[in-house]
Regions:
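Alpha-helical protein-protein interaction modules
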Residues: 2-142
Length: 142
């Protein structure tokens, strides 16, 4: 089915852009990193991907730049996106693709993984020092 192929290719594109963003950050090329993050956002919106997919690159960039307020705001939006059901078939690009029944539960199961990873990652210490960190934890911990 063409819709499935488009959806799969859109996710492959997002993954490729995230990998390229990693390389740009490793090469200490902030201009290219920002361009790649912006491109990932635009591509995600054009291809009607989930908010989580659209916000991943800007969060990755903000975290790498250790921009605490921006990273915290984006992490909050990422986590919130995992609490909202995403109906893939509502997109005009994918009207015939069914939303899997277990998708919402699967999305929610990512929340503790993300919070735990962020809480343990030494590179995220700056984020845990942000004034809004305890409130974010309280909002999403179950």
């Amino acid at each position: 089915m063409l819709e499935q192929e488009l959806f799969d290719q859109a996710h492959t594109l997002q993954s490729t852009l995230l990998s390229m963003l990693d390389y740009a950050l490793a090469e200490k090329d902030p201009q290219r990193a920002r361009l790649l993050a912006d491109t990932a956002v635009q591509a995600g919106k054009i291809f009607d991907l989930s908010d989580y997919a659209v916000l991943s690159a800007p969060f990755q960039l903000a975290a790498a730049e250790q921009d605490g307020p921006k990273a915290l705001e984006l992490l909050d939006r990422l986590l919130r996106s995992l609490t909202v059901p995403w109906d893939l078939s509502a997109s005009p690009l994918y009207p015939h693709l069914p939303t899997k029944d277990a998708a919402e539960e699967s999305q929610r199961s990512l929340i503790p993984v993300l919070l735990d990873g962020t809480a343990r990652d030494p590179d995220c210490a700056f984020l845990r020092a942000e004034p809004g960190w305890p409130e974010l934890l309280a909002r999403y911990q179950t």
